[in-house]
Every structure is written in C-alpha cells, then in structure tokens.
A protein has these predicted regions:
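Conserved Radical SAM active-site core
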Residues: 1-3, 17-23, 29-101
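Residue-level signal for well-ordered alpha-helical segments
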Residues: 3, 7-10, 44, 56, ...
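Conserved AdoMet/S-adenosylmethionine-binding subsite of the radical SAM
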Residues: 68-192
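Bulky hydrophobic/aromatic packing residues
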Residues: 11-13, 51, 56, 102, ...
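Flexible, acidic/Gly-rich N-terminal and inter-domain linker regions that tether
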Residues: 1-20, 29-32, 175, 180, ...
C-alpha cells in the first residue's frame, strides 16, 4: 500500500486534491495500469488513518490494484469520523462497501470477457477505450450518473499509437453526447 497527496487526474473529480490510498493487490492485470505491484507494504489501520489525516485534505480515493479486495469498512469509518469523504476507483468485479461515498467503476470486461461486473450502480462509469464496441456499456450506463471515456494510454507505445486512440475517443465523444472525455492529467503533468 502507498499513501500520497496529489491531484485527481481522471474523471469527474479531475483537478481536485485528494489523498490516495493505493492498494497493491488486484484480481486483473491491465497493460496500462499505473500501479507498481511490487513495492507495497502492509500497514495497520491506525497508521493509514494517521497518514491520511496528516495531509489536511477532506477527500480520499481508495485505488489500486483493486481496493474492493480489502475490507474498507474499518478504515472508512475511522476516516469518516474525521470528516473525510471516501471515493473508490474499482474494476466493478466485487460489491462495494456502503461506507464509500463516491463509486467510480472502470470496467475491464473488454479485456476479460469471462469477468462479470457486479457493481452496476454508482456515481461514475469510466471506460478505458481499447478498441471495444462501446455499445457493450449501454445497459451498464443506466446505473451511473456520470459517464467518462478515457483513451488507453500505454507508456511503451509510440506517440502515433497513443494518438490514434485519442482520435477515436474524440470521435466517440462527439458522436455520443452521453460520454465525456477523461484524460489522465496526472501523467501529462508528471505527477502521481
């Protein structure tokens, strides 16, 4: 696990400061994931809470890896006691603890056809576009208030390869007004 204070670079809360609590475990492995799965240490709930409140920020994002693999209730209740709003970025393959205030599901079923999305309700649906048919999300969209599409950006790809993904996403957003563009601003800014 790692804990750090930064600017949310994706989706609805893009541009706002948050404390990120990033867990290392995940039930999937996506090429574009920006999580380093090798450098995580386990921490006590007290240690996590102390680190989070030291940043004097009232917003936390549980991310990963897959944060829903953790029991977030004890940590979440303690943080809420300090007036902190809790968000989660999840692949949606596991139900989310009710202690969470904001649910962002970023489904990966375009890469893992045998994986089913269990968390079908939430605040934000954020799809990473990898060439899939966007109609596969028509039913899922109904359970979410905000719908974002994000071009797949792979650090090892060429500018041309990543640029092609950006152009396709631009076209999708123009032709499908129910989708809004999400870019990974933190990568452009060179921050976590």
């Amino acid at each position: 696990m790692e804990i750090f204070h930064s600017i949310q670079g994706e989706g609805f809360h893009s541009g706002t400061p948050h404390v990120f609590v990033r867990f290392g475990n995940c039930n999937l492995r996506c090429d574009w994931c920006d999580t380093d799965f090798l450098t995580f240490d386990e921490q006590s709930i007290d240690s996590i809470v102390d680190q989070v409140i030291s940043y004097d920020c009232d917003r936390v994002i549980f991310t990963g890896g897959e944060p829903a693999m953790q029991d977030l209730s004890p940590i979440g209740k303690r943080l809420k006691h300090h007036g902190i709003s809790l968000s989660i970025e999840t692949n949606g393959t596991m139900p989310i603890d009710p202690v969470i205030d904001w649910i962002c599901v970023s489904p990966k079923d375009q890469l893992y056809p045998n994986v089913s999305i269990k968390q079908r309700l939430g605040d934000e649906l954020k799809v990473v576009y990898c060439g899939q048919d966007m109609s596969m999300y028509d039913d899922l969209k109904e359970g979410f208030t905000h719908h974002f599409i994000q071009p797949c950006y792979i650090d090892s790809d060429t500018v041309e390869q990543n640029g092609k993904s950006f152009q396709i996403v631009e076209k999708i957003v123009k032709e499908s007004p129910g989708w809004r563009l999400s870019l990974q601003m933190h990568k452009w800014m060179g921050i976590l």
